[in-house]
């Protein structure tokens, strides 16, 4: 009985490790593919650039000092653009 239980648990552990390794390889292969732009990330970058520059332009029109919009997540506002820190 103990031997059967040990064998089942061993097989389950091997299966979990194999599945995890396969998922990691799949993720790495997707990241390593050349020529596939990450459209979601590009859209976020463009959105941050747009938000920061538009925010400053609106404040300038109201004759106020341009208080740059805070960029979050490792980005900062510089020259009316969000740039990666």
Curated annotation (Swiss-Prot):
InterPro entries: Hwtx-2-like. Expressed by the venom gland. The keyword Disulfide bond applies. It comes from the Eukaryota. Disulfide bonds join 52-66, 56-77, 71-82. SUPFAM superfamilies: omega toxin-like. Keywords: Disulfide bond, Neurotoxin, Postsynaptic neurotoxin, Secreted, Signal, Toxin. It holds the Pfam family Toxin_20. Residues 1-22 form the signal peptide. The keyword Disulfide bond applies. Residues 23-48 form a propeptide. It is found in: Secreted. GO terms for molecular function: toxin activity. One of its GO terms (cellular component) is extracellular region. Postsynaptic neurotoxin. This is U4-theraphotoxin-Hhn1g. It comes from Cyriopagopus hainanus (Chinese bird spider).
